[in-house]
Regions:
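Hydrophobic/aromatic residues positioned on beta-strands within the core alpha/beta folds
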Residues: 81-83
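Two-component/phosphorelay signaling modules centered on CheY-like receiver
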Residues: 12-31
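The feature encodes the CheY-like receiver
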Residues: 58, 76, 88
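Acidic, metal-coordinating helix/loop segments flanking the phosphotransfer/catalytic sites
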Residues: 32-50
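Conserved acidic carboxylate
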Residues: 9
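Active-site residues of response regulator receiver
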Residues: 54
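Acidic catalytic/metal-coordinating carboxylates
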Residues: 35-38, 61-67
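C-terminal output helix
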Residues: 104-117, 125
Length: 142
């Protein structure tokens, strides 16, 4: 089973950067929600391995969204990372396990992503096939 990462981000440039990162990790699937409402709607269909949450969403703060997600059975122990431009934000007092400060850089993101979701080498898995579309593995939650 493939690992799924739910990324909640409303800024298209940040989504594009994250899509670029995930193209370099073909064993992972990225699901993008652009606000808290679409993220909560996606929770009924997903059981992600990781949550990446922007803090300044158009309809709620990322910490509020994470609190709501933690009320869903089975979602209490999913690692959650705040992805923010708020330089002063610290995860103490929240259930975020880490903070990734913007601006984000691809090499740093790859290293941090690999620390949270260790690449799984399975001898019976076929080698990843390059896809025609650069972002063909990204799903947008509606």
């Amino acid at each position: 089973m493939r690992d799924v990462v739910l990324y909640v981000e409303d800024h298209p440039v940040n989504v594009l950067l994250m899509q670029t990162v995930f193209e370099l990790r073909p064993e992972l699937d990225l699901v993008v929600a652009v606000d808290g409402l679409s993220a909560m709607a996606a929770t009924s269909k997903l059981r992600p391995s990781l949550l990446l949450l922007d803090l300044r969403l158009p309809d709620c703060h990322g910490t509020e969204l994470l609190e709501r997600m933690r009320c869903i059975p089975g979602w209490q122990d999913i690692p959650a990372i705040a992805v923010t431009a708020e330089a002063e934000f610290m995860p103490a007092g929240t259930s975020f396990c880490d903070v990734w400060h913007k601006p984000l850089r691809v090499p740093t993101l790859l290293t941090r992503l690999d620390r949270v979701i260790a690449p799984k080498a399975r001898p019976d898995d076929p080698a990843p096939v390059r896809r025609q579309s650069m972002f063909s593995r990204t799903t947008f939650a509606v």
